């Protein structure tokens, strides 16, 4: 088993004081959340999986295995936990220790979600390669099936009766008995995720709606916004959904009747989790915020996890703020997802110290200059640096790219 930059730490530099309820420690957008009675398991764009003591708001363990974004997390019956990533891998971690007991690499694309069966025997994963993976926890045996006609699986969840729900970009919701499809329901728009609300499946859509599904079709619908919804969580009593604009709505699980709306101020909210009394929101600012489920009131301070390291009031500094979440301008990386940009110009790609670059970047022959940095943001990382773990972000306007390059020339010296 080849472990990629596995790190572990106990209550180290990302430990929060006991009086602070928010969880600070990720250096990139928080894209995965799972909760147990006293723990939180998070994953983020910074490739880290963090296990938290929920009561003390303290990091218990920090792990790095995945190449790229950690897309899903789940707790397991034996006290261990699971993580899945953009790299197509599913890792099973023991309750104690810092190395995974099993790593499955059955998917050829990012994994959209994980779901534990009600009997605790099976972990299901759905991937953008259109396949479902069923992992038997006791034996480690894996079964993979083609599920959505080669289209992306965008969410999975188990109903209390043991049937698996999967949704995909082929605009279908499928109910599975084991690995056998038993019901297929057409969807009106592209689904972005699913969570189980009692005996129903709460599905979020790119058209800004949440729809509640039973075995015979739609039970309830709530149109929340004109923007795509990015995250969903549910319990037998409540459904929470979040948009790419950062709004969060809480609804009744029975009929999606509105309860309250939150504005975390975190940029896009990429992940949600519900307990009996709390809502947790994972934001684009790397912060996990906590809210009272009954009132919608914040439980923590809400201070931004990442601030601009340098601001001279220029347009370039304004454009830089989108980069500051994942990169620092100081000699160290500031516990962020990407390498420091200190001393950027004149540096060969993938040579900043103390950063675990992907193999694809280490093979490239690029030197960072004003011209190459501008081209990176003109065409995007997927085109300019294929194999990069960097999100495919672009700066479309030439004047904004020029302003960013001028700012970096000043700020990275």
Task: State where each predicted segment sits.
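Electrostatic cytochrome c docking/interface patches
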Residues: 295-319
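Gly/Gly-Pro-rich "capping" loops immediately C-terminal to redox-active cysteine motifs
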Residues: 331-369, 392
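Short coil/turn segments within WD40 beta-propeller repeats
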Residues: 28-31, 46-50, 68, 87-91, ...
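The canonical Cys-X-X-Cys-His
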Residues: 316, 320-329, 404
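Hydrophobic beta-strand positions that form the internal "hydrophobic ladder"
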Residues: 40, 81-82, 123, 164-165, ...
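C-terminal capping alpha-helices of c-type cytochrome domains
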Residues: 369-413
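WD40/WD-repeat beta-propeller blade N-cap
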Residues: 23-30, 64-70, 104-111, 146-153, ...
């Amino acid at each position: 088993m080849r472990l990629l930059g596995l790190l572990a730490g106990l209550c180290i530099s990302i430990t929060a004081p006991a009086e602070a309820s928010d969880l600070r420690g990720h250096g990139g957008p928080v894209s995965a959340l799972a909760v147990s009675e006293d723990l939180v398991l998070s994953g983020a764009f910074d490739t880290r999986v963090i296990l938290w003591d929920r009561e003390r708001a303290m990091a218990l363990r920090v792990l790095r295995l995945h190449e790229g974004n950690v897309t899903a997390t789940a707790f397991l019956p034996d006290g261990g936990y699971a993580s899945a990533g953009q790299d197509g891998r599913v890792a099973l971690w023991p309750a104690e220790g810092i190395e995974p007991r099993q790593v499955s690499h059955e998917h050829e694309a990012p994994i959209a979600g994980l779901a534990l069966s009600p009997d605790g025997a099976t972990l299901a994963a759905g991937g953008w390669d259109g396949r479902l993976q069923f992992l038997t926890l006791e034996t480690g045996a894996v079964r993979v099936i083609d599920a959505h006609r080669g289209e992306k699986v965008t969410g999975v969840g188990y109903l209390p009766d043991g049937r698996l729900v999967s949704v995909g970009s082929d605009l279908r919701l499928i109910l599975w008995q084991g690995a056998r499809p038993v019901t297929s329901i057409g969807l009106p728009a592209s689904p972005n995720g699913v969570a189980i609300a009692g005996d129903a499946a709460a599905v979020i859509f790119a058209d800004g709606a949440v729809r509640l599904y039973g075995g015979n079709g739609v039970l309830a619908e709530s149109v929340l916004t004109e923007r795509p919804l990015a995250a969903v969580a549910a319990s037998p009593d409540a459904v929470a959904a979040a948009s790419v604009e950062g709004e969060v709505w809480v609804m009744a699980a029975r009929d999606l009747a509105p309860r309250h709306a939150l504005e975390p101020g975190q940029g896009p909210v990429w992940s949600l989790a519900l307990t009996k009394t709390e809502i947790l929101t994972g934001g684009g600012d790397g912060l996990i915020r906590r809210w009272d489920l009954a009132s919608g009131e914040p439980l923590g301070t809400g201070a931004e996890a990442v601030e601009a390291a340098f601001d001279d009031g220029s347009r370039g500094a304004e454009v830089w703020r989108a980069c500051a979440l994942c990169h620092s301008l100081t000699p160290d990386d500031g516990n962020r997802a990407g390498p420091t940009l200190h001393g950027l110009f004149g540096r060969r790609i993938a040579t900043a110290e103390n950063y675990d670059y992907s193999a694809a970047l280490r093979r490239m022959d690029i030197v960072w200059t004003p011209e190459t940095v501008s081209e990176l943001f003109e065409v995007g990382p997927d085109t300019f640096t294929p194999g990069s773990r960097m999100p495919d972000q672009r700066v479309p306007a030439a004047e904004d790219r020029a302003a960013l390059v001028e700012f970096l020339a000043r700020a990275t010296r």
